[in-house]
Amino acid sequence: KWNIDLLYNTHYEQNRQTTDTYSHHTLKNNIYDICQHNDIDRKGITHYVRTGAEYKFNDNAHINLAYTGVFNPNNDNHSYSDGNITTADNRTKKEARMHNIALDYLSGFGMKAGINYTPYHSESHQQFTYKDNKNQTSEFHTTSGQTIDRWKIYVDQSHTLPREWTLNYGTSLTYASDHNTQFYHTQNGTDMSELNTDNRYNEYTYDFYVGFSKNMGERLSFSASITGEYYKTARYHAWAAYPTAELTYVMTPAHILQLAFTSDKTYPSYWDLSESTGYISGYEEVQGNPMLKPSTDYSANLNYILKNKYIFSLAYDYQPDLFQQLAYQSTERLALIYKTLNWDYQQSFSATTIIPFKIGHWLDSHVTLQAEYRQAKCNKFFDLSFNHSKWIGLAMLQNNIILSTKPDIRMELTGLYLSPSIQGSYDLNHIWAIHTGIRWNFANQKASIQVKANDLFNSMEGNIDVTLRNKGQYMDMHTNNYSRNITLSFTYKFGGYKEKQHKPIDTSRFK
């Protein structure tokens, strides 16, 4: 039996952001007060297409071939910076395309196998003009590109054993080849060729895992697995193990305990691993870091579920080698450098309570309260270090409201508040947000019209204050990002159609 599906959608996005930066910059025992105002406009269109063909041998075995394409034909980015030491005009045009071909097979005896190939290419052109406080003008043009070829092959096997045991094991091999280039072309005679970069990067990741699960009667269930990984690049290679375990104990139907431990790894983007330098303004720049390492995330969670409704959780999260991009005021020149570096670690302890409640048949609500202690430590941040910690609070109320049953009109209303928090050496202000939406279901629940408004008051990303005070580093930044968005959608289901869920293609490491 054959099944064939085809999906196409397109997405246009326009974003506006303003940033005000006040930098109290210490350089060679002198202090420079630098003020910069940046206006940034971004717009672009994305086309997404997917087609797949599946052949079912029987109910338990099938083979599937799928193609996915994502195309960004024209993304424009224009930023204008005005300050007391420099003004700059920065225009960038970018286009990108990604293809993915995946072949997957599921046997009738629990084996899964597959291979997929992902080629990706992007190129951008930047026109940069800046004028210093002496009215001297400089111009340059950059061309940059990224070409990635990624292959993955995997085999998984699952066995159902006697006495309610389940055994799983498998292996996978991923190879990625990345080619990053950036070339500077000056337009006023200044030689900038020392900033040109042409980097090739090969990455090998080999994984193998084994796991099992067991139901011990009606009250106790347990599962565990361990993944071994060998990761290799030209500058870094290491073996690592990632265990997971989960235990569920049903004391009574009204009292359930869950204990879980997980571990995973996060890889830096391929562009961050390049040696490139990009300019935001005449004062701000972004540098790559070819010495970046993957980070690991270890998490432990204890949940107590009361009456199948109320949830009380304790969690601990430890992330060695966590990498994030932070700003640094150079001690060698007047430059604010943004660079992604590995920290020693970030860790957090948190306690969470989720309380649902209903009022009649028209209101179904959930209250979430969380208290978190977060610590970020880095002993080698350029020529500095930081050890930053803070208590953080989160409160969220989610409401599902039935406005009418005939006609069927429902409303969603969510509000959240996050207290002042930290990011590395930064202090961040509090944020809050309101999300809402209304849905009308009709035609015997086959059709619906929905209007949604996210961040209704533009308060979540529209009013961010960043404060840096660390061993002579002194900076204040205010960012206003237009994050409010309103969507209108119409859905009609033909017959018994159910939308298929497809595993998304991982593009998180692409530029």
Feature roles, as predicted:
Residues R16-Y32, V70, N75-R91, E123-K134, ...:
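Outer-membrane beta-barrel translocator domains and adjoining extracellular loop/strand segments
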